[in-house]
Amino acid sequence: QTASSGLVVLMDADGRVLKTVAVGNLPDHVSFTPDKKPILVASEGSPICALDDISTSATESTDSTLASDANGSVSLIDVSGGAANATVTILDFSSFDKTALLAEDVRVFFPGSSAAQDLEPEYITTNAAGTRAYVTLQEANAIAIVDLVNKTILDVASLGYKDWSATGLVYDGSKKDSTSNGVFANPIAYTGVPLKGMYMPDTIASYTAAGQTYLVMANEGDTREYSCYEEESTFGDTSGSNSF
């Protein structure tokens, strides 16, 4: 994670290393187009808190301004000429403006980070033709759309919000449910709650029906929690929580 580049190791079925390819910082997921060319890599480039004194205790600093944050990226490894001759193209988000993304409800929020640094590719899927890739940007509550033919990131699209006040939805926001023999009991359930939640997907897959590409996402929800930065809090820790 501390290196400027991550590595993808290409091996044959017997485990022999054919080539090692440098990709973006902190690779998280490796995927394939339908024809296996190119190989796709999502690299998060997550923030790294500074060390107070790495020669002694190696305790991380709690000062977020001292953290380093590498660019998130998507790497395209071309193996059409064989694994031993593989080449790589690394795409990042340098062309995307932070202010414009914020206006479109894309979360860009780590202190001092640009959009290119803050967006963290998590997981990748492609369409059936292998011409488009869809990349989850979990912490940003968004997905990136990649043109695999022209090797460019076309868009970063916010996934919006789930309205928990809608009729028929039941909301359980408590992590203090009682259990009996490991089974949840007496869940705290509310309806009509005036809250909106973010989807923040992790894994993504795709399928085609009636000529249309559909994306299926596992909406895990996530928070950033480091020694130098933590965004999570409970209602009890916020002002005005009693009135809610």
Go through the PLM ranges and name each one.
Residues Q1-F244:
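Beta-sheet-rich non-transmembrane sensory/scaffold domains
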